[in-house]
Structure formats: C-alpha cells, structure tokens
Amino acid sequence: MKRITLTLMIFLMVNLLQAQVQGKSAIVLIETQNEWMHKDGKLRKLLIQDETMMLKSIQNIEKIVDFARKNNIPLIHCGLRFDKGYPELANGKSGLRKAIPKAGTFLKEGFGSQFYESVKPIEGEFIVTGRVGASGFTGSNLDIYLRNNNIENVYLVGYATQVCVESTLRDAHEKSYNTFIISDATSAFNKMQQEYVLNEIVHHFGEHLTTKEFINQKK
C-alpha cells in the first residue's frame, strides 16, 4: 500500500512539474499570415526563393500548433496589420518603413493580413496588437502579456527568419526571456540566409531546435 501511495505521489509530482514547465513556455507565431503562407500571398511570390523550405515550414507550423493545442501550451499570434495609408510608419524613407507601403502589404482590411487558415487563432488564444516594427515587441502588448502570464521560455516560429524572427529573438533576449527558434518552422528567402542566421546569429541570443526536438522535449 505504501509503495502504491509513493508511486502515485511521484507520478503526481512529475505531472505537476511538467505542467509548471509548460506553463512557463509559449509559442510566438510571427506573421503566420497569408502574405507569407498562402500561395497567392504577395511576399511569398515576391521574396521566397526556396519553395521547398517554405512548404516544410508551413507543415511544421501546422504540427506545432496542433501539438500545442493538445498539450495546453500557449499560442501567441503576432502578426502585422496597418491602417490604410500606413500612418503607423510615418512616411518612412528607408528599410521596412519604406518597403511595406511600397509593396502594399499587411493592410488591415486586406487578404494578405489575415491569418493563414490552418493556423489561425481560435478562442482563448492571444493575438498581439499594436505591433509596428520588425520585432514582435515593437509598439505591441507582447511583453506585458508574457510577463503577466509568467512566461519565461519563448519559442519562435514564422517569417521571415532573417528579418522579423531574428529581430524578435534579439529583443526577447534583451528583455531576459529564454528564447528559441524552431528552425524548420521558419523560413528565410533562401537557404543561405536561413543557415547564416541559425549558424552565426542565434547562439548569441538563444538556441535553435527542430520541430521534432521541440515536440519530444514537451511530451
């Protein structure tokens, strides 16, 4: 009887520990929107040079979202959405502040800014608002949400690896989060850019792991 009770106590403690670890982790989906993920998205057509890598990233994001929902891991949807005329970017003369209005992407009422159908938010999942920059934290309520929910471990998926995913990685590190890129659930424009970020940049600000490694870690 004592042995059964001890076994039960150990089982409950292990499950409690797992719940605590999962409760301190969240997945941030960077721009899992039609602009990137839909075959007719402007940015996918304009910028993605490696369709194989892109398709693989979409499949893995779908796996991660499904796994997270089944295992109560918070999903945070961090898109970009701008008002008509892009007043948030204040007539930018260079960089993304110039490129986004020129391309006409991420308009609030447009098809491209909508979340991709297979991974769109469901009831109870947090949607970041206010974001105006490359980092998911710029101008947004992401940081306050993470802190209010005691989240310490941030896992990043989405687009594009060498732009907004990397910017969010750096920013999260500076804000003292433990940050991870799920490497095969992101995509750069081409393989060279992807490998450069993973091999030369990530280790300064966090770690990277594969979808399989993430799922095995969280089981």
Residue ranges and their predicted role:
Residues 28-31:
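N-terminal nucleotide-binding beta1-loop-alpha1 segment
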Residues 42-49, 93-101:
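Short glycine/proline- and charge-enriched loop/turn segments
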Residues 33-39:
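Short acidic, Gly/Ser-rich segments with clustered Asp/Glu that frequently serve as metal-coordination loops
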Residues 23-25, 40-68, 73-75:
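A short alpha/beta connector and helix-capping loop motif
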Residues 19-26, 36, 62-71, 88, ...:
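Active-site-adjacent betaalpha module
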Residues 73-80, 182:
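Short beta-strand segments at enzyme active-site cores
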Residues 4-14:
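Sec-dependent N-terminal signal peptides
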